[in-house]
Amino acid sequence: MSENHSEGASRPVISRRPAAGLRADHPVHVPGDKSISHRALMIGALAVGETRISGLLEGEDVLRTAAAMRALGAEVVRDAPGSWRVAGRGIGGLTEPADVLDMGNSGTAARLLTGVLASHDLFAVMTGDASLRKRPMRRVTDPLAACGAGFHTRSGGRLPMAVRGTGEALPLHYRLPVASAQVKSAILLAGLNARGETVVEEPHATRDHSENMLRHFGATVQVEPTGDGAGRIVRLQGQPELRAADIVVPADPSSAAFPLVAALLVPGSEITLAGVGLNPLRTGLFDTLVEMGAALTIANRRIEGGEPVGDITVRASTLHGVEVPPERAPSMIDEFPILSVAAAVASGTTRMRGLAELRVKESDRLAATAALLSVNGVQVEIEGDDLIVIGCGGPPPGGGLVTTYMDHRLAMSALVLGLTTQAPVTADDAAFIDTSFPGFATLMTGLGADFSCA
């Protein structure tokens, strides 16, 4: 799919139970990690010298980040599929863009880039697609305003947004009211061009790709536990000289989740997923599935580009319900829709606790995930910020039309559900899958999935 997706062109897809299990006679490769790909492009643009990136995700979200960094003066070149070069401008060296920065569907790109822009002496305007324009930005702009940047948004703190950055950014000491890797990262990126120490306190540990990559580029980043031991305090020394570095982007565990869960649920399946990122702050889904009874093993553990990776083999398994504690939510925040699909097929009840953050994703993912299941005959309840799924102990009824709300993860979850149900499941629009997992349908049908255009 091209970089410029038309918001008006939907792509309905039907998913049916396959005649046999999902299998491959070779390791399966899913796209590069989206979170790391965004950060590699942004931090590479702030470094001195040429950064080489291999395994970059070439989905629409990351391509928007690449275009934005070019617009800000960095040289960003694609040499081959997944192989990119970034000639950085140095901290404080980005230039004012001539046009609006369109971040498409990517909340990660929009929020992280807001941090970059906040500590540069320039003016920029940022927008996004219809979905992104509904998502709140104040959780980022409120703390960043304290560093001296100015922001003007639509009502409710939504895009489009005008940013007046500052070349004299003040270092921040900020306590996150809700654990969010995006907000933490935006503050750290702004802190790169602030004199002194920037400190972020988070109530629960969130993915630490920004901290790992900043260290890889030469920044001084220290992490210590909070007093209660549940969260972390991150300290960044401002105005380092970031040095260009080589980055190997691991396979995205959030993307690997979809073929992995499909193989767990379709009888007779067995696949191996190669080089999947195993950052312990991203593996909550894998831990939960093992608790549910998944036959999941990890081999060839190694470090690539500063991140732990490994090869995951998964076999069809009989699952049972579990309770997912709220402190695990940050390590699997993007995986709750697909976990809910596994819970729907499992026996017993699965309760996922503390999911408030799902309400401000590409859609209200909490409500949308519940609707995805209920329209296909699965009993599901929302109690406060908890999602409760009463498993069918086998194939759910299915037969529903799932409204995906331009949300790639809901669309993929619906299509995986359809591989398990008695009647086919239709996703009303699968076009937005390309934002994070280009080639999803090709990969899945290659394993034996039965997808067809509606």
Curated annotation (Swiss-Prot):
Primary localization class, coarse = cytoplasm
UniProt key word Zinc-finger = no
NCBIfam families named among the record's database cross-references: aroA (TIGR01356)
Region (Disordered) residue spans:
1-31
- Provide the function of this protein: Catalyzes the transfer of the enolpyruvyl moiety of phosphoenolpyruvate (PEP) to the 5-hydroxyl of shikimate-3-phosphate (S3P) to produce enolpyruvyl shikimate-3-phosphate and inorganic phosphate.
Could you give the subunit structure recorded for this chain? Monomer.
Keywords from the named record: Amino-acid biosynthesis, Aromatic amino acid biosynthesis, Cytoplasm, Transferase
- Recorded source organism is Granulibacter bethesdensis (strain ATCC BAA-1260 / CGDNIH1)
Give the main EC class. Answer: transferase
Give the source's domain of life in one word. Bacteria
**Per the similarity annotation, which family is this?**
Belongs to the EPSP synthase family.
Q: Which reaction does it catalyse?
A: 3-phosphoshikimate + phosphoenolpyruvate = 5-O-(1-carboxyvinyl)-3-phosphoshikimate + phosphate
Q: Which gene encodes it?
A: aroA
SUPFAM superfamilies, per database record: EPT/RTPC-like
List ligand-binding residues for phosphoenolpyruvate.
34, 107, 135, 182, 365, 409
Q: Name one GO molecular function term.
A: 3-phosphoshikimate 1-carboxyvinyltransferase activity
The residues responsible for catalysis, as annotated, are 334 (proton acceptor)
Give the protein's recorded name. 3-phosphoshikimate 1-carboxyvinyltransferase
- From the Swiss-Prot or TrEMBL record, state where the protein is found: Cytoplasm
One GO biological process term is:
aromatic amino acid family biosynthetic process
As recorded in UniProt, its EC number(s) are 2.5.1.19
The record ties this protein, via InterPro entries, to: Enolpyruvate_Tfrase_dom, Enolpyruvate_Tfrase_sf, EPSP_synthase, EPSP_synthase_CS, RNA3'P_cycl/enolpyr_Trfase_a/b
Query: Where does the record locate the signal sequence feature?
Result: none
Cellular component terms per the entry's GO annotation: cytoplasm
Question: Which residues participate in 3-phosphoshikimate binding?
Answer: 34-35, 39, 180, 182, 334, 361
Q: Which PROSITE patterns match?
A: EPSP_SYNTHASE_1 (PS00104), EPSP_SYNTHASE_2 (PS00885)
